């Protein structure tokens, strides 16, 4: 028995398996297993927010307080049917599996969150400190593959809890209507899985930037640095894992870079037609700060200084629009640089690389009334063939040429 990822990664070694999955031979019964990824989701909760602001002298004050409780649940009741396949590519059911004989478990989370933010505007300064508190209890009830009626005879449970304060601080100084500086320091947080003792993802995130106006040109430039003290990974089928959904701690990572956004309008403010253009660029640099061995395909064996996988160093996008009171047309170009699919440094090996791509999209909208409009979107206008990922199960193609139309109604 071999998974599709192993077969596609090395079709020469698994030639017999490959001939079965591509339908070039008449297989035996039960040669192919197809999993019914049956899941149900349930979510409920309540939240409230209180906002109060006032003026005193030259200062503006605003306080916001929020509370939220919610419960989320995922119910997996899955099975694997078995098939044979003919040399003409026709699959025939040979074993109709009993429902619930694969993943048969309920995962849930009870979460309470609260926050308070305070905004102070004084002369040219704006300060925005705040803090959030999260308290989460995560549970899993696994009934096992042999208890499809969920009597609990083989019930295995596990639980993990986390409580954390998440502070942050932002500041902005406005020199005039055309130029300002801003910065911030914020704690980042992502909850752990339901494995007992697993730590949450935590980071300290810094940013410093400027916003400016130069005539018709508007822009924003930001530098950022994210210091992860504990990065989380997930065992997902979508990332080449087993699909257990278990999370694992991947240690310390630094992420830094710059972002640039420019907007320009070629027309005057009183013109019937508007011709805006926007350009955005992001440079991202990543580096693990510790070494570890990982059985998860997303990381591989990691050494200090290795780059994070699936993060391109260079990303670029631009949009040009024609806007009128009755319609708008937008053409967008997006570039994603090459990226590695396993942690590493230096030149990226061919079998661990997803090449760069540039895709052009076209969209349009016609306003029938103030509330009703028709939309048209053309994805990958030039029908470029490109790879988007190497997981799950080898190279995955990006979206081919496609046309989508619809109606948009606003209340």
Residue positions per predicted region:
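Gram-negative outer-membrane beta-barrel transporters
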Residues: 56-57, 248-343, 370-373, 382
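Flexible, surface-exposed loop regions and adjacent strand-edge segments
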Residues: 2-14, 76-89, 143-153, 191, ...
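Transmembrane beta-strands of outer-membrane beta-barrel pores
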Residues: 69-75, 122-124, 133-139, 185-191, ...
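Structural signature of Gram-negative outer-membrane beta-barrels, strongest in the C-terminal barrel
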Residues: 41, 57-62, 68-70, 103-228, ...
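Face-selective signature of the C-terminal outer-membrane beta-barrel domain
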Residues: 1-143
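Outer-membrane beta-barrel "beta-signal"
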Residues: 209, 213, 261, 397-411
């Amino acid at each position: 028995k071999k998974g599709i990822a192993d077969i596609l990664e090395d079709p020469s070694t698994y030639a017999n398996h490959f001939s079965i999955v591509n339908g070039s031979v008449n297989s035996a019964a039960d040669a192919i297993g197809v999993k019914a990824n049956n899941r149900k989701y349930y979510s409920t909760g309540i939240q409230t927010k209180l906002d109060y602001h006032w003026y005193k002298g030259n200062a503006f004050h605003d306080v916001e307080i929020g509370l939220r409780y919610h419960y989320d649940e995922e119910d997996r009741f899955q099975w694997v049917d078995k098939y044979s396949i003919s040399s003409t590519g026709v699959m025939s059911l040979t074993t109709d599996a009993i429902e619930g004989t694969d993943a048969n478990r309920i995962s849930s989370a009870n979460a309470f969150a609260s926050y308070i933010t305070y905004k102070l505007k004084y002369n040219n300064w704006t300060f925005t400190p705040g803090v959030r508190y999260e308290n989460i209890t995560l549970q899993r009830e696994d009934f096992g593959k042999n208890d499809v009626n969920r009597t609990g005879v083989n019930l295995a449970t596990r639980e993990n809890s986390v409580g954390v304060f998440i502070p942050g601080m932002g500041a902005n100084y406005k020199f005039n209507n055309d130029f300002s500086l801003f910065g911030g320091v914020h704690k980042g947080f992502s909850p752990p899985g339901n494995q007992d003792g697993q730590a949450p993802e935590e980071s300290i995130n810094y940013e410093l930037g400027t916003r400016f106006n130069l005539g018709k040109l508007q822009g924003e430039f930001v530098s950022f640095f994210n210091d992860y003290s504990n990065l989380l990974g997930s065992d997902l089928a979508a990332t080449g894992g087993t699909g257990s959904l278990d999370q694992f701690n991947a240690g310390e990572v630094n992420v830094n870079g710059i972002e640039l956004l420019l907007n320009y309008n070629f027309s005057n403010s009183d013109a019937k037609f508007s011709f805006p253009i926007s350009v955005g660029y992001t440079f991202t640099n990543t580096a693990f700060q510790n070494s570890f061995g990982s059985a998860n395909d997303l990381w591989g064996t990691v050494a200090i200084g290795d780059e994070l996988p699936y993060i391109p160093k260079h990303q670029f996008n631009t949009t040009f629009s024609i806007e009128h009171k009755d319609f708008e047309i937008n053409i967008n170009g997006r570039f994603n640089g090459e990226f590695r699919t396993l942690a590493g440094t230096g030149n990226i090996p061919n079998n661990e690389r997803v090449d760069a791509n540039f895709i052009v999209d076209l969209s349009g909208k016609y306003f029938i009334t103030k509330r009703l409009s028709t939309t048209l979107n053309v994805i990958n206008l030039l029908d470029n063939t490109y790879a988007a990922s190497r997981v799950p199960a080898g190279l995955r193609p990006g979206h081919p040429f496609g046309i989508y139309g619809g109606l948009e109604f606003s209340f």
